[in-house]
Amino acid sequence: MTATAEGTAAPTTVTGRIARVIGPVVDVEFPVGSLPPIYNALKTEVTLGGETRTITLEVAQHLGDNLVRAISLNPQDGLVRGAEVRDTGAPIRVPVGDGVKGHVFNALGEPQDIPKSELQVKEYWPIHRPAPAFDQLEAKTEMLVTGIKVIDLLTPYVRGGKIGLFGGAGVGKTVLIQEMITRIARNFGGVSVFAGVGERTREGTDLFLEMQEMGVLPDTALVFGQMDEPPGTRLRVALSALTMAEYFRDVQKQDVLLFIDNIFRFTQAGSEVSTLLGRMPSAVGYQPNLADEMGLLQERITSTRGHSITSMQAIYVPADDYTDPAPATTFAHLDATTELSRPISQKGIYPAVDPLTSTSRILDPQYVGQEHYEVAQRVKEILQRNHDLQDQIAILGIDELSEEDKIIVHRARRLERFLSQNMFVAEKFTGTPGVFVPLEETIASFKAICDGEYDHLPEQAFLNVGNIEMAVEKAKKLQS
């Protein structure tokens, strides 16, 4: 499949007729020998209330007897049996190149913030593309410094890797993604592509306006398929955004950041489509090809020689159950996992990252250095010991602990609070400016706390500050 200008995809004259409509599933009959291939886009016009609009369908199955089963990517109001359907002769194509930056698109690549005639792009790429060949891949192990203490110290991100943000509803996944977009745009430049998959329309609007306000929109393309869209659209929006990102990586030779919010909605849409197509469900009602669908998306999000796509994916965990097949299938593809914890968020500690369950494959001396690794392990040991003592404290009280354990508990509470940090995107709510903490300062600050150098400071001084000097200043204000 090659890139084309929009007008050069030779339109076919093959037309069919709608034979059956069941919700978003449409069966279309074509002439003998003219069946469109799987994934081809079909177009039909409907008139409703005096207004004519185009509906796009995507071929999903060949049924026999010259029938294809397609999934509608638009609301299907107005579709009727016997209506004419045109085979476009190609899969869905989306615009690529510098012209997409600063604009909002739907899953079909249609701009939502400007008229299509004003979009200045020369090429359109099909959204169904093969993953890079094995000999083109490059495994990067360079750390991506975010300036967020808890992430840089305990779950360091890989430049060119896949990062998962796991958490239930309302623990801060979208806020953390917005924060990462802001930090990376401010500190690294480069191109970002955001895919809003099945999330709230309000959140999409907020994100667009915030990015406009912060001046990062000109280097970002946004692709949305929101909650009210048909399942076919929600299933394809991530592929549309990924195709735009692949162009920047492969043609313009740039490092790209791809944000997907929320990958669970991609799985959910696949489940809905699978049920509509009559497939037998598998575990917990998910589609039988769950791992295959996830693999087709994730294998394209990769680094090729010299250029990378770094992806950050928010992953909703249904009922906080990490054994659910949807989040469990995603785990296998990730280089780092950041788990957001409800108990931590209830303490008012943000970002609510669980330091004991979050992981990274590069938290290893050969990648991050011996000092970073040792400090991270000491922090985890203190926090783990504090966690183990909580039942004893709840039953007997903290006074019954040994002197050594009392010191560990008090130190752990300071570490917990010092893992919190003000966000740039939350400035308007908290009234406190966000802060970027260099990695060297993060390591030195946590090492000093673990060594007991700041045991004399009150716990509250460590909450929502940047480096340790800010905690000392806050302690002086609290004591005055």
UniProtKB/Swiss-Prot annotation:
Q: Where does ATP bind?
A: G167, G168, A169, G170, V171, G172, K173, T174
Localization in the cell: Cell membrane
**Database matches in Pfam families:** ATP-synt_ab, ATP-synt_ab_N, ATP-synt_VA_C
Q: Which reaction is this enzyme known to catalyze?
A: ATP + H2O + 4 H(+)(in) = ADP + phosphate + 5 H(+)(out)
* UniProt-listed Enzyme Commission number(s): 7.1.2.2
The enzyme's main class, written as a single word, is translocase
Is Heme one of the keywords UniProt gives this record? Answer: no
Which residues, if any, are the signal sequence?
none
Alphabetized UniProt keyword annotations: ATP synthesis, ATP-binding, Cell membrane, CF(1), Hydrogen ion transport, Ion transport, Membrane, Nucleotide-binding, Translocase, Transport
Q: Name one GO cellular component term.
A: plasma membrane
- Give the way it sits in the membrane: Peripheral membrane protein
Q: Which family does it belong to?
A: Belongs to the ATPase alpha/beta chains family.
Q: What does this protein do?
A: Produces ATP from ADP in the presence of a proton gradient across the membrane. The catalytic sites are hosted primarily by the beta subunits.
Q: What is this protein called?
A: ATP synthase subunit beta
Query: Which species?
Result: Thermobifida fusca (strain YX)
Organism taxonomic ancestry: Bacteria, Bacillati, Actinomycetota, Actinomycetes, Streptosporangiales
Protein encoded by which gene: atpD
